[in-house]
Amino acid sequence: KYYEPNTVQGRSVIVHLFEWRWKDVADECEQFLSPKGY
């Protein structure tokens, strides 16, 4: 259980991108997560 996940108030999502290449993390954040409000 995550007791202090350091999320924005009212949100509880944590994205697990461990072992991804930095370019792939950037692409995922810019092209998928950010447009969906994460």
UniProtKB/Swiss-Prot annotation:
Keywords: Calcium, Carbohydrate metabolism, Chloride, Disulfide bond, Glycosidase, Hydrolase, Metal-binding, Secreted
Coarse class of the protein's main subcellular location: secreted
Keyword hit for Phosphoprotein: no
Catalysis performed (reactions): Endohydrolysis of (1->4)-alpha-D-glucosidic linkages in polysaccharides containing three or more (1->4)-alpha-linked D-glucose units
Keyword Hydrolase assigned: yes
Location relative to the cell: Secreted
EC number: 3.2.1.1
Cofactor binding annotation: Binds 1 Ca(2+) ion per subunit.
Gene3D superfamilies per the UniProt record, alphabetical: Glycosidases (3.20.20.80)
Domain of life: Eukaryota
Gene Ontology MF annotations: alpha-amylase activity; metal ion binding
Tissue: Expressed by the venom gland.
Any GO CC annotation of this UniProt entry: extracellular region
Cofactor(s) essential for the protein: Ca(2+); chloride
Family: Belongs to the glycosyl hydrolase 13 family.
Assembly and interaction partners: Monomer.
Name of the protein: Alpha-amylase
